[in-house]
Amino acid sequence: MEFSNQLFMITGCPEQYHHKSLKTGLNILTKKSFDKYGGFILFEAKNIPPYYFGHYLRMVSLPSDRPDLIVYESKQSCRSNMVILGEIFLLSTQHTFIMLNDFGLDIKSISAQDRGKWYECIAGSNSDAIKGHFLFQKTCKASDEPNIIDVDDSNKKYKPEINHLDESNILKRAELLTTVTQSLSTGDAKMAGVIINKNDILDDILTLIIKSGNVSAFKTLINIIGLSNDQIFKIIESSFSHNQTKIYEFLESRYPQLYLESSIINGRTDIVDNLVKKGSNPIVVLHKAAECAQFDIIWNLSENSLINQNDIDIAMTIVKQRIHDILFYSDNPDVEKEQDILELLENIKLMRDF
């Protein structure tokens, strides 16, 4: 098995390993637990069984930098004593299997729709709890601390002190997220606003909506919740990182200046080029790109006729100020990028022959 290929793991609701909770991030079995039960079972997409009990699919990876990693391979799967749980998907939706098809799963013999229906069938009467738990898990961030699992330790003495919500609280919060998301999607702003304010779940709701690309819910949310510029910046960056095109296209129309600035800060050359073509001021873009040391964005402006020598001189002054600040105030005084940009700006002046 090529470990460079994407691996997946099937989990149940709640996500556990022999009654011990799993969590997003690194999970490690004690030696005794690994020897007793054989470890985490991982698959490449092409080897995921057609019918296999579970409720969720996790994208996973192996912590290959750890010397205590153990992996046993077989033809169809591998077993390991530790695993990093990544993004979570519902097995009851055909979209999950369409995604797996892109990773090599053959869905010709059993269609994505039929696979989804089978998993929905095994979910049984707890489908609401399963979907609620899924929504909660999508908002969980990976902890820096590993989750140590000892299946025989009822006192959890081997576990680091991590604050875990108990199962009832998890499901309660998941139900709140489900209710709010549904209310926002249907335009019921009043109910959503009351629940968000009462339960302090704005960040979770934003994360969930952006990851799912739910534009209608997002539009309703920002109409009832006042967002600061910092929050808008984070939302734009998050929509970039999750490649949610419809979300960041809406943000462009709603917050054009913040959208432009965030695109420059994040080095999204393709988006910045498009915004300049649509009419964004290339001089403003040049100076912000100089401030953020975005070489490619500056290079793409090198032949823009609206930029003159004075604009380039100002950009060079901005870069020199950045170099000064890095050398005198930064713990990592590396100014190679800035020196490259100064050289680029000098070359643009020569090329343009002002």
From Swiss-Prot:
Recorded superkingdom: Viruses
Membrane-spanning segments: none
InterPro entries in UniProt: Ankyrin_rpt-contain_sf
Record keywords, A-Z: ANK repeat, Repeat
Disulfide links within the chain: none
ANK repeats: 201-230, 253-284, 286-314
Name this protein carries in UniProt: Putative ankyrin repeat protein L284
